[in-house]
Structure formats: structure tokens, C-alpha cells
């Protein structure tokens, strides 16, 4: 490099970052909704939300019980938080809480647990937001909801048939969802795993923000958590991991071809993809009829194994 005249960046430590963030979150709340004061259990996943999340919900008048809020640099996401809600489910039931929120280590994912201890995944959280926005006339078929190829077909049917909203699927990963949201000017997207993107407030996933907005909707509906999320039935799914030993030098064109096969039953869906981290072909079959799901699973598993043996 001959010319050394170029700008360099610098790092600045932001004073009271958590305080500023708290004020931002509070600024997103709808002043026209009287929020119910709830008994909430928070599973912070021994991660980034361990301190700020309990403080925010407490400041808003909720009774807060926190678990997995003692990070030591090693225990992050270890059988807790959005990765594993078993502890949260038990605590919600034991404490007779109204709702439970599970965050992952970096706080960008949210999984909800209702008052009965039942897990509510990202699909159903997005469905709740879509239903709410439809009532407010803030979304329509021109602005689709963006999720990934992993989202349940029952969720897609609910959006289209009940709300008249189209669903568009991206590749797995919240970054891919965000890109598609920008392309289609969408205000709502996310992943089944709990990334929820409310682009009117933030251009990336934010678990605490999503949790606050969930409480708003539950308050407005004046329903329990379980009744608020009683929107649709997820279709049964069957997942099969098919291992292979040979190095796959081909681009696995057969996977693309199998995914393009049109199923006669519109209430069925298949997804076949190569794992990016392990020598596995992942097969997902879902549909309204569990017997057909099992039938299609066996059929496609056999086809894949035959292809891999060639």
C-alpha cells in the first residue's frame, strides 16, 4: 500500500448502555394498551439477559422470578434458556405463573411457555404477532411474513387461509430472514427456533422486545397465555437423519430434484437438505395426516439411501 492516508475506526465504551437500551424498549410500548401485571418466570440462559431482563419486567410492575441468571462464562445455554425450556416449564407450573420467557445466550431468541408449562415456539409467536397486526390493519398480502424452510406447514396454512397473509421461506438463519424481509418490505419475520424480527422497532432479533410485545397482545386480548396462542394446530412432523461415509464430491443434485417433486396432497411437505456441519442428509416430512407422514418418510428415506449408495 503506497497511500497510507485513510480513515481508521476507534472503539468507544458507551456509558450506561443498559440504561439506554431499557429506555428504548420502554419507548416501543403501546401507550393505548393497559398492560396486565403478570407473574413471570424468566430463563436467562446464563447469558446476556441475566440482569437487564429481570430489571425491565420488574420496572414495568410485573412479579418476576428468574432462573439461570448466574453466568460464569461456561454455563451459557447449558440445558437452559431457549435451547431447553424443561426447567422453565417446571418452574412456571410450580410457581403458578402466568407466563414464562426463555432467552438464549446472546438474547436474540425467545421461546414462550404458557401457564400450563407448554412450550410455544417461534412459529406460534410470529402467528400471534401476525394476527395482532392484521386486526390493526398493519399488514396484508402485499407484505408477506418471512420465515425459513423449517417453519411448520400448519403455520403457513393459518397465515394464508385465516389471515390472508402470504408466507415466504428463506434458507435457515436469521440473517437470511432479515435479507428477505428487506427485499419484500416485510415488517414481520423470524424462525421457529425463536428469532423474532419486528422491523418497525428493530432490524434484528431481540428476545426481550418480543417478550414485551407478547405481554401487550395478551393484555389487549384479555386472555390467558394458552388461550392467546390457541391459533392453529401444528402439523405432525417426522425428522430423519441419514448418515453417509463416502465423501460427496457431487453437488447432490438429486436433493434439489427430490425437493422439487410435487406432492399430490397439498397438506404434505418434504424438505431434504445436507447438513453443513455433519456428514448427514436431513429429511423432514410433515402433513396433516400422521399416517401419510410416516409413509412418505419411509419412501423418501429409501430413495435417498439408494442414491447415496450409488
Task: Identify what each model region corresponds to.
Residues 23-26, 51-58, 86-93, 127-134, ...:
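Predominant activation on well-ordered alpha-helical scaffold segments within soluble catalytic domains
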Residues 42-45, 103-105, 147, 190:
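Active-site flanking residues adjacent to catalytic metal/cofactor-binding acidic residues
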Residues 46, 105-109, 117, 194, ...:
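Short, glycine/acidic-enriched loop or turn micro-motifs at the edges of active sites
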Residues 51-55, 78-80, 110-116, 155-161, ...:
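Short acidic, glycine/serine/threonine-rich loops at helix termini
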Residues 61-68, 119-124, 164-172:
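Short hydrophobic/aromatic-enriched beta-strand-loop microsegments
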Residues 99, 136, 140-310:
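Phosphate-binding and adjacent anionic-ligand microenvironments
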Amino acid at each position: 500500500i503506497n497511500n497510507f492516508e485513510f480513515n481508521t475506526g476507534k472503539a468507544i465504551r458507551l456509558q450506561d448502555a443498559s440504561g439506554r437500551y431499557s429506555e428504548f424498549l420502554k419507548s416501543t410500548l403501546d401507550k393505548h394498551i393497559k398492560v396486565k401485571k403478570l407473574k413471570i418466570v424468566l430463563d436467562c440462559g446464563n447469558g446476556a439477559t441475566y440482569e437487564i431482563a429481570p430489571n425491565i419486567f420488574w420496572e414495568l410492575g410485573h412479579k418476576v422470578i428468574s432462573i439461570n441468571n448466574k453466568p460464569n462464562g461456561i454455563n451459557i445455554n447449558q440445558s437452559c434458556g431457549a435451547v431447553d425450556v424443561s426447567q422453565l416449564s417446571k418452574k412456571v407450573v410450580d410457581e403458578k405463573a402466568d407466563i414464562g420467557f426463555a432467552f438464549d445466550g446472546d438474547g436474540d431468541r425467545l421461546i414462550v411457555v404458557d401457564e400450563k408449562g407448554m412450550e410455544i415456539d417461534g412459529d406460534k409467536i410470529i402467528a400471534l404477532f401476525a394476527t395482532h397486526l392484521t386486526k390493526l390493519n398493519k399488514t396484508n398480502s402485499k407484505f408477506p411474513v418471512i420465515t425459513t424452510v423449517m417453519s411448520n406447514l400448519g403455520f403457513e396454512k393459518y397465515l394464508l387461509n385465516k389471515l390472508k397473509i402470504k408466507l415466504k421461506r428463506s434458507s435457515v438463519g436469521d440473517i437470511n430472514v432479515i435479507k428477505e424481509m428487506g427485499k419484500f418490505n416485510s415488517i414481520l419475520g423470524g424462525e421457529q427456533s425463536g428469532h423474532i424480527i419486528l422491523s418497525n422497532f428493530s432490524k434484528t432479533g431481540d428476545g426481550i422486545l418480543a417478550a414485551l410485545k407478547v405481554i401487550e397482545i395478551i393484555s389487549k386480548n384479555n386472555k390467558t397465555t394458552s388461550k392467546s396462542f390457541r391459533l392453529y394446530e401444528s402439523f405432525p412432523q417426522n425428522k430423519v437423519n441419514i448418515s453417509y461415509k463416502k465423501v460427496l464430491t457431487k453437488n447432490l443434485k438429486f436433493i434439489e430434484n427430490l425437493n422439487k417433486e410435487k406432492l399430490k396432497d397439498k397438506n404434505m411437505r418434504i424438505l431434504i437438505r445436507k447438513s453443513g456441519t455433519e456428514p448427514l442428509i436431513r429429511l423432514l416430512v410433515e402433513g396433516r395426516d400422521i399416517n401419510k407422514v410416516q409413509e412418505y418418510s419411509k419412501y423418501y428415506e429409501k430413495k435417498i439411501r439408494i442414491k447415496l449408495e450409488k
